[in-house]
């Protein structure tokens, strides 16, 4: 479970004489295990900034983000030290951005096998699992040993989503995960996300895709004038 309480983010522009730009303010919501909470709203309103504050890419200005860990204890992600945040990102908290970011000159199969290594299974088993997942999302076998930089936009995004879901995070943050996918690819990703929900993963996602909201969301908030409103 994730409890966000009175969360705010401001950006202070030191090169602009201390100009303060509001990202969002006074955001409060609870996301439950096995549920997906959708965040909607106009572009540039602060939705992605909110996700980045939860993930701690940005440090919130005010408020708290209390996350219930796998071991049953709670941690305030706003106040947690960097070491704790990095450990949680590696083992429990996933983030799907709009762009694939991976180690260059490493094959898709090796990248996914490495991501699965947290399962502490034998190398052969991990590789078989990686092949299974790549096949499941419709990435051609001829691409498995290729660098993701050579993939099409849709193939990159399918791999991007797969890397996050295959690690089976307890909390998953999604920033427009289906933005560049065709209908068939969307259906595959919908299935993976629904499977993750069934396994208990808590999800908070930014969406513009109405089909995705209808298929996946258990609740929805709309961001308007930098504030979050239940829909």
Regions found by a protein language model. Give the residues of each.
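The feature captures the beta-strand-to-loop junction immediately N-terminal to the Walker
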Residues: 40-42
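Helix-to-loop junction immediately C-terminal to a conserved catalytic motif
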Residues: 55
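ABC ATPase NBD Q-loop/coupling interface
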Residues: 64-87
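Q-loop/switch helix immediately C-terminal to the Walker
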Residues: 99, 106-117
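Conserved ABC ATPase "signature" region
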Residues: 124-142
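Conserved ABC ATPase signature
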Residues: 147-151, 155
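ABC ATPase C-loop
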Residues: 164-165
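Catalytic Walker B motif of ABC-type/P-loop ATPase nucleotide-binding domains
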Residues: 172-175
């Amino acid at each position: 479970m994730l409890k966000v309480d009175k969360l705010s983010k401001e950006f202070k522009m030191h090169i602009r004489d201390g100009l303060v730009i509001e990202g969002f303010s006074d955001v409060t919501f609870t996301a439950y295990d096995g549920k997906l909470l959708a965040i909607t709203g106009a572009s540039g309103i602060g939705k992605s900034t909110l996700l980045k504050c939860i993930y701690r890419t940005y440090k919130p200005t005010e408020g708290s983000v209390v996350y219930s860990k796998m071991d049953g204890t709670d941690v305030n992600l706003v106040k947690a030290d960097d070491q704790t945040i990095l450990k949680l990102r590696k083992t429990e908290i996933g983030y799907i951005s709009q762009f694939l970011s991976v180690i260059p000159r490493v094959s898709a199969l090796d990248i996914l096998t490495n991501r699965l290594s947290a399962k502490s299974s034998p190398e052969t088993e991990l590789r078989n699992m990686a092949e299974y997942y790549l096949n499941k999302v419709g990435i051609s076998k001829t691409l498995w040993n290729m660098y993701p930089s050579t993939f099409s936009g849709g193939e990159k995004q399918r791999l991007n989503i797969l890397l996050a879901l295959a690690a089976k995070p307890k909390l998953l943050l999604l920033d427009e995960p289906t933005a560049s996918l065709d209908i068939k690819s969307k259906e595959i990703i919908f299935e993976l996300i629904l499977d993750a929900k069934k396994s208990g993963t808590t999800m908070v996602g930014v969406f513009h895709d109405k089909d995705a909201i209808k298929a996946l969301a258990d609740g929805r908030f709309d961001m308007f004038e930098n504030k979050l409103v239940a829909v």
